[in-house]
Amino acid sequence: MLINKKIWVTASLCLLGVGNALAQFAAVVSPPRFELSAKPGGRLTEVVGITNNSAVQARYRMKTADWIFGADTSVTFTDTLAPESCRPWVSIESREIMAPPGRRVGFRVQVDVPPDAPPRECRFALLIEGDEQQVKNESGLSVPVAGRIGVIFYVAVDGAAPLLDITAAGVREVNGVRLPVLKVKNSGTAHGRLSAFLSGVDAKGQNLDFTPSTFPILPGETRFVELSATTRRGEVARVAYPVTVRGQIEWGDQRMPFDQSFE
């Protein structure tokens, strides 16, 4: 029987502690996120695969949480029910599971969309937490370490979709490298995620390919998206400016031509 729970958010491994924490939480989860669609009054049932890669039986605690996607692309989980959260729509199979060593178990997540739900995006994540372990650090001190994996769910209700406005936003230094940047505003009702076929020749004559970061742009947000540059051999490149970037940017079933100079 599914237990009515509260849910929302991302697919990242958060290791809290030091040392061999990964060995203490040897779980592999697939898929890392779900991007789904539903009608008002509809029901979705999905299965998350959890594989215990350790040599002993593992216990995982299952729960849900709301999340905040920070300006620095960090994710913060919270148990507090967020305004307009869709977590009351969600049920999960159990609060705890036991996974045999080397085995994959399936875990069901169910979303029941209310009949009167407006076009919107329901976002949530299943949190999978391992037992706390005492791990010795380099100084020989025992440190409590726990592992957590969050699996993102996006459910577009009644045709909810992103509406992106994309413009060139100059050049910014990212991790010591100057990269072209796009300004992306989402005035739609669902998240957007960019993909692109972009290329250009820089001031040194390098033939380069440009790829946007694939972080989500949530409804109502404006984010700056870097374009990483590689040579035709796939090697990371340092761009000599000015450079004109041309090609096509896509998100969902939408696409737009792009032709902009960066200096």
Predicted regions and their residues:
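Ligand-binding face of N-terminal immunoglobulin V-set domains in extracellular IgSF glycoproteins
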Residues: 47-49, 93-128
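Beta-sheet-dominated interaction scaffolds and their linkers
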Residues: 24-58, 94-96, 162-181, 214
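Sec/Tat signal peptide C-region and signal peptidase I cleavage site
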Residues: 19-23
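Terminal connector regions
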Residues: 56-68, 112-154, 233-263
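Surface-exposed binding patches on compact interaction domains or structured appendages
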Residues: 25-30, 54-108, 195-198, 202-207
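Short strand-edge motifs at loop-to-beta-strand transitions and within beta-strands
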Residues: 34, 46, 105-109, 223-227
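Transition segment at domain starts
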Residues: 141-173
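Short proline/glycine- and polar residue-rich coil/turn motifs
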Residues: 97-105, 214-223, 254
